[in-house]
Amino acid sequence: MNIKYFLLIITILGFLARSRVLVIAGLLLLTIYEFEIDFVFEFLGNKGIEIGLIFLLMAILSSLVLSPVDGEVIKDNLLSWQGTVAIIAGVLATKFNGMGLDLLQESPQFILGIIMGSLVGIVFFGGIPVGPLMAAGIGAVLFKIIEIIKG
């Protein structure tokens, strides 16, 4: 399939799924492709995830800057059972994200399935498409489980 048509399909699916993020990403990539600014693709391939993660982390941490929390409240929260669960979830999420990044670097063709799964999740389950790395990480874990079961 021609990459231009693929990007157009992704953009249209993003529009149908009401995913502004997917529409903007698709349109930007389509524009970059049409204007033959190929070095942008190389840059995004090499640094895009890192830059995106920096902005994501800044967005999350900015809430602490806007409404500072007392140190005692932070300590009480971290030492509660909910805080412990949150810490474990953070550890698992970062591990899964790392596994997902490895999977996508080794087998980039899986991104198509992740995009399709994300679209199904958005359209039918009201999901939010913010975690392709997490989706790939869950896929990597499921692949390992299936490999173990199959022997």
Curated annotation (Swiss-Prot):
Primary location recorded for the protein, binned into one broad class: membrane
Cell compartments where the protein resides: Cell membrane
Keyword Cytoplasm listed: no
Transmembrane segments annotated in the record for this chain: 7-29, 49-69, 84-104, 110-130, 131-151
Keywords: Cell membrane, Membrane, Transmembrane, Transmembrane helix
Keyword Membrane: yes
Pfam families linked to this entry: DUF441
Bilayer topology: Multi-pass membrane protein
Top-level taxon: Bacteria
GO cellular component, one term: plasma membrane
Family (UniProt): Belongs to the UPF0756 family.
Protein name (Swiss-Prot/TrEMBL): UPF0756 membrane protein Hore_21770
